[in-house]
């Protein structure tokens, strides 16, 4: 010990401080790891003592895939069994079924798309939230040993959890469990709990009861707050007969199989066509068509008149036609240039 202390004192102060800081920042790994054939469980402790002021009994832990690679898509079932050593039987307190579970690192039942809980009593579990055992307002009868049975990939694993609940300061809530619900143990506890009775799996295959839909009442007509009165069967039959009588038959088939139209139907069709034609030729429709046409025509005539006025103003300002001045300066073809008079310079040819 003296040699070790002497060697430590010889280390540089900076290196010693760095080693102490690294040791302080290193997370302390604690807990117990129980290995199984399909999954393993890591818990801080398989037994828990519930304090007198604790409102809930909770044992947290994580289910892990440690034996081989974790499956990419799997399903499984998780059950919570309560042991009764005095009567050598067990009671199933909780059952859950997980389906369509993806691979999330090495944790089991994380991110499953479907979960169903066909059975839930006082004790429950939520392994996807890292909760292996949960009891709300625990009482002394809730103390004892529980077994978490996990079935996945054709394997069954058992993990024992123990809860201790002191009686002082707690109300007594008796846990009802009849002798029929407590299944007897044949042989050892391990072998009996590992073999699943087909009757126990019936809870997973039985569909949940369908809740009856609430009766619907017809909505009252808009604008009134009164509820429509129920009508008798005779009134409904009379209304149906009146509707049938008012609806004309389109036609009948003759002996040759040709459709003969009913006169009332033909007259109604002709009357509808006449009304449509008359409506199209009414004064309102004609005004709607001719109105925009007249407006466009007036705009066009106004533009033509404006252009004519501009041309007239240009001619009046010059006093003569510009085209006539250009025409007068031109010399006809074949004409001789004018003879210059004495004393005037002759025009130079252009």
From Swiss-Prot:
Superkingdom of origin organism: Viruses
Main location: virion
Extent of the signal sequence: 1-31
InterPro entries named among the record's database cross-references: Herpes_gI
Keyword Protein biosynthesis: no
Biased composition, class Acidic residues, residue ranges: 232-241
A Pfam entry, by short name: Herpes_gI
Ranges annotated as biased composition (Pro residues): 206-221, 335-350
Cell compartments where the protein resides: Virion membrane; Host cell membrane; Host cell junction; Host Golgi apparatus membrane
Region annotated Disordered, chain positions: 202-253, 316-350
GO cellular component labels: host cell; host cell Golgi membrane; host cell junction; membrane; viral envelope; virion membrane
Membrane-topology annotation of the record: Single-pass membrane protein; Single-pass type I membrane protein
Keywords carried by this UniProt record: Glycoprotein, Host cell junction, Host cell membrane, Host Golgi apparatus, Host membrane, Membrane, Phosphoprotein, Signal, Transmembrane, Transmembrane helix, Viral envelope protein, Virion
Transmembrane segments: 286-308
Virion surface side: 32-285
Positions annotated as glycosylated: 56, 73, 153, 256, 262, 275
Topology feature Intravirion, residues: 309-350
Record's subunit section: Interacts with gE.
Reported function: In epithelial cells, the heterodimer gE/gI is required for the cell-to-cell spread of the virus, by sorting nascent virions to cell junctions. Once the virus reaches the cell junctions, virus particles can spread to adjacent cells extremely rapidly through interactions with cellular receptors that accumulate at these junctions. Implicated in basolateral spread in polarized cells. In neuronal cells, gE/gI is essential for the anterograde spread of the infection throughout the host nervous system.
Family: Belongs to the alphaherpesvirinae glycoprotein I family.
Protein name: Envelope glycoprotein I
Protein encoded by which gene: gI
């Amino acid at each position: 010990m003296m040699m070790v202390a002497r060697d430590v004192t010889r280390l540089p102060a900076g290196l010693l401080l760095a080693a102490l800081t690294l040791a302080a920042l290193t997370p302390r790994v604690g807990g117990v790891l129980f290995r199984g054939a399909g999954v393993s469980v890591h818990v801080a402790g398989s037994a828990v003592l519930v304090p007198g002021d604790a409102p809930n009994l909770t044992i947290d832990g994580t289910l892990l895939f440690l034996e081989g690679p974790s499956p990419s898509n799997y399903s499984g079932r998780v059950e919570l069994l309560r042991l009764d050593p005095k009567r050598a039987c067990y009671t199933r307190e909780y059952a859950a079924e997980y389906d369509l579970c993806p691979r999330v690192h090495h944790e089991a039942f994380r991110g499953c798309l479907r979960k169903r809980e066909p059975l839930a009593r006082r004790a429950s579990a939520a392994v996807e939230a890292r909760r292996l055992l949960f009891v709300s307002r625990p009482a002394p009868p809730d103390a004892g040993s529980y077994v978490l049975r996990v079935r996945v990939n054709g394997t069954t694993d058992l993990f024992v959890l123990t809860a201790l609940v002191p009686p002082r300061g707690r109300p007594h809530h008796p846990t009802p469990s009849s002798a029929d619900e407590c299944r007897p143990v044949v042989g050892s506890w391990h072998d009996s709990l590992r073999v699943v009775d087909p009757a126990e799996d019936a809870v997973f295959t039985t569909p949940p009861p369908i809740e009856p839909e609430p009766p619907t009442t017809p909505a009252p007509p808009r604008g009134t707050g009164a509820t429509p009165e129920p009508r008798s069967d005779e009134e409904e039959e009379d209304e149906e007969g009146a509707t049938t009588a008012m609806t004309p038959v389109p036609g009948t088939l003759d002996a040759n199989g040709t459709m003969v139209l009913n006169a009332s139907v033909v007259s109604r069709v002709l009357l509808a066509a006449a009304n449509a034609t008359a409506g199209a030729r009414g004064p309102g429709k004609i005004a709607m068509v001719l109105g925009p046409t007249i407006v466009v025509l007036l705009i066009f005539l106004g533009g033509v008149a404006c252009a004519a006025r501009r041309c007239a103003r240009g001619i009046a300002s010059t006093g003569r036609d510009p085209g006539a001045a250009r025409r007068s300066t031109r010399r006809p073809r074949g004409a001789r240039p004018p003879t210059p008079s004495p004393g005037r310079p002759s025009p130079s040819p252009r």
